[in-house]
């Protein structure tokens, strides 16, 4: 897999760092990891989405879930996209998914546990959306963005205001899944109101 990633990086002008990186401090800026210690990341692919003026990283991570006696260790591939301009902070989860696998992601506040869109009931039934500033989130989530999200398989997307963290899968991504992860994030940004200057 590392050899395939290296070839993919060489062919596309990306960088690839296979070694274990214990410095995961930036990932801790996301609420998902408030209660889930990250042990390490590895197999980091990094590149530039020129069309959206954003830098991305796809890496394998290992994180812990649960109390000491019932500690579970998870390995998955996560994507982080640094945005060209600030956006509202929010979390989108597929309804019921994290209930089955592990504790619900800490929502921003009890009052905004689930932001509903009456006009887009199917979206609100499929995804749990939460965040600090409901008004800013409602104006940011345009009809186009909501329709795009409805049409895609999403597990977890989180904005920390300057970057997105995307769990497309809940497993270590295969080499052939990387292009679809990048296509999804690029199309996601195209459906967001970003200042790309």
Model-derived features with residue positions:
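Charged, low-complexity intrinsically disordered regions
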Residues: 3-27, 31-197
């Amino acid at each position: 897999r590392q050899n395939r990633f290296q070839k993919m990086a060489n062919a596309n002008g990306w960088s690839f760092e296979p070694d274990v990186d214990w410095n995961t401090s930036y990932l801790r800026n996301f609420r998902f990891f408030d209660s889930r210690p990250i042990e390490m990341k590895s197999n980091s692919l990094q590149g530039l989405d020129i069309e959206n003026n954003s830098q991305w990283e796809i890496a394998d991570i290992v994180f812990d879930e649960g109390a000491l006696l019932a500690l579970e260790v998870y390995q998955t591939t996560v994507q982080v996209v640094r945005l060209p301009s600030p956006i509202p902070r929010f979390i989108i989860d597929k309804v019921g998914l994290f209930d089955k696998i592990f504790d619900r992601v800490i929502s921003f506040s009890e009052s905004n546990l689930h932001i509903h869109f009456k006009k887009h009931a199917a979206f609100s039934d499929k995804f749990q959306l939460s965040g600090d500033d409901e008004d800013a989130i409602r104006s940011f989530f345009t009809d186009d963005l909501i329709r795009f999200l409805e049409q895609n398989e999403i597990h977890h997307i989180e904005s920390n205001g300057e970057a997105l963290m995307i769990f497309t899968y809940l497993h270590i991504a295969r080499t052939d899944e990387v292009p679809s992860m990048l296509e999804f994030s690029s199309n996601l940004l195209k459906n967001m109101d970003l200042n790309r200057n």
